[in-house]
Amino acid sequence: MLLGYCGSGYYGMQYNPPHKTIEGEILTKLFDVGAISEENSLAPKKNSFMAAARTDKGVHAMLNLLSLKITLREDTVAKLNAALPPEIRVWGIQPVNKKFNARSACDSRWYQYLIPEFILIGPPRSSLLHRNVGGCYREDGSQEVWDTFLEQTRGRFSGDELCRLQDTAQKLSESDPLVQDYVGLLSGTLSGYCLSPSKLDAFEAAMQEYVGTHNFHNFTTGKLWGDPSAQRHIKKVVVSQASPGWICVRIHGQSFMLHQIRRMVALAVLAARCQLPPNIVRNYFNAGPRKYIPRAPAQGLLLEGPVFDGYNTKLRNLLYCEIRPDDITLERMCRFRERQICTAIAHEETQRHVFCHFVRQMNRLATPLI
């Protein structure tokens, strides 16, 4: 089953009752259209459910692939799409042999990460982040934006409130009304930030440092340097300006660990913001004590699609249909990405200011980067 989904409001891909998940929604609707029994709708293992890539809470997919056992009829896809909510679409269902496993047959995966341009603004002089890299940082016009914001905060908040907001010992929740008001004001100010070509180039240079085989133990949880399972191979990274105000990062890798991409993007953002040399990234592949890297928001991450080159070669040799979307389906997927996924990412930023919260989090970073 080839499918795409907007992950906003879902607790990830994998079936995990009582939480709302993509697999849970698919199972329910498969039963509703008569493709599986009621008993099997409550137990994914009975249907041999396996995804080519698992996506976490809030993460989207332009294309993912599920291997599963169902009763397939001519109208199954049409009935499923009629029953499913608009944020989940089935692109097609293709018969495969009984031994096919979507996860093990997948050679590699393409991911995208969308970030607003303002996330690359330099740190304010008063921030902990600026103090940590003060010797490397040269003024690039960002401080003018922060000076404007400072004047706005003095007119909006009392001295006591500003102290509470700036005190790193007070870990105010993002849901705190004071923080929400502060970040809402910050969002309006940062929207006027103009990204320079040199800042975008610096971010891309940092992202290119990931290409190759490296030990990504600092980019996930529960891994130590030297653990073979922390070795990952990144095939390609492409950075471009996707739409006005947004940057698209495309990453092609064999496989990824929990939070790996979000931390890869976060570290490259920090390097570009603070004007650190791109090869600072290499320090995080090295042996030694674990280094802290914040996680960029899940809302910007989407699975572009799994790749089945090896398996498709076998299918071609047997004169079978390959596992890949045709041109018409690809057009539908691209429209879905724009209308459902990109719209949801932009809407969440407008409503919840997730990337503004992340800018504030980075500004308060006390951990040395060098």
UniProtKB/Swiss-Prot annotation:
Reaction catalyzed? uridine(27/28) in mitochondrial tRNA = pseudouridine(27/28) in mitochondrial tRNA
Q: Can the keyword Transmembrane be found in this entry's annotation?
A: no
List the SUPFAM superfamilies: Pseudouridine synthase
Which EC numbers characterise this protein's activity in its record?
Answer: 5.4.99.44
| Binding site residues for substrate | Y111
Kindly name one Pfam family recorded for this protein: PseudoU_synth_1
GO BP annotations, alphabetical order: mRNA pseudouridine synthesis; tRNA pseudouridine synthesis
| Matches recorded under InterPro entries | PsdUridine_synth_cat_dom_sf, PsdUridine_synth_TruA, PsdUridine_synth_TruA_a/b_dom, PsdUridine_synth_TruA_C, PUS1/PUS2-like, TruA/RsuA/RluB/E/F_N
Per UniProt, the keywords (alphabetical) are: Isomerase, Mitochondrion, tRNA processing
Entry's Gene Ontology molecular function annotations: mitochondrial tRNA pseudouridine(27/28) synthase activity; pseudouridine synthase activity; RNA binding
The record's subcellular location field reads: Mitochondrion
User: What is the active site of this protein?
Assistant: D56 (nucleophile)
Member of which family? Answer: Belongs to the tRNA pseudouridine synthase TruA family.
Q: What is the name of the protein in this document?
A: tRNA pseudouridine(27/28) synthase
State the organism named in the record: Saccharomyces cerevisiae (strain ATCC 204508 / S288c)
Q: Which classification does the entry list for the species?
A: Eukaryota, Fungi, Dikarya, Ascomycota, Saccharomycotina
